[in-house]
Amino acid sequence: MDKFVIRTPRIQNSPQKKDSGGKVYKQATIESLKRVVVVEDIKRWKTMLELPDQTKENLVEALQELKKKIPSREVLKSTRIGHTVNKMRKHSDSEVASLAREVYTEWKTFTEKHSNRPSIEVRSDPKTESLRKNAQKLLSEALELKMDHLLVENIERETFHLCSRLINGPYRRTVRALVFTLKHRAEIRAQVKSGSLPVGTFVQTHKK
């Protein structure tokens, strides 16, 4: 009696058979790593936390982003972000205060245990910082505020963030649009200064 070999098609995605031993790998960028700290982002979140009349939504967002990072002792000292987070532990909103306590405790614990372990810091070059200072100057004049005012810093940092942390065409056009509106639209300027128009919303609607 003849024998035949019958080949059946292999089913690729059979729901009946699962590979329990297989590992799933997820691609990660270097900036997504907990010990890789972009100093600009730390400063941006710091201004969000310190800006008067900041919305709860923005405070929670900033703290949640900070929770994903563990700055080195040097970054904590140079930016004073630890001091800012520490103050937020006494915030009147319980959710904000609780989140701030979590961030502060995690940072403090890690720093004490790994005091000699360096982190990777990403900083802007001098030319970029010079161009950004000029943008802050234009914004301060349009807002009729001093250049070192928190609101001026917050608007510029939000703009820089939305433009992928690059001094490019979109950044320059967005700054010009913001300055024009602040100079010629008194009602918008008043809303931004009072906090009734959140900085994030203001910048987003003028992004070019």
Curated annotation (Swiss-Prot):
InterPro entries: TFIIS/CRSP70_N_sub, TFIIS/LEDGF_dom_sf, TFIIS_cen_dom, TFIIS_cen_dom_sf, TFIIS_N. CDD domains: TFIIS_I (cd00183). Keywords: Acetylation, Nucleus. Residues 1-21 are annotated as: Disordered. GO terms for biological process: DNA-templated transcription; regulation of transcription by RNA polymerase II. Residues 131-208 form the TFIIS central domain. One of its GO terms (cellular component) is nucleus. It is found in: Nucleus. Residues 40-114 form the TFIIS N-terminal domain. The modification N-acetylmethionine is found at M1. The keyword Acetylation applies. The keyword Acetylation applies. Belongs to the TCEANC2 family. This is Transcription elongation factor A N-terminal and central domain-containing protein 2. It comes from Homo sapiens. The lineage of its organism: Eukaryota, Metazoa, Chordata, Craniata, Vertebrata. The gene is TCEANC2.
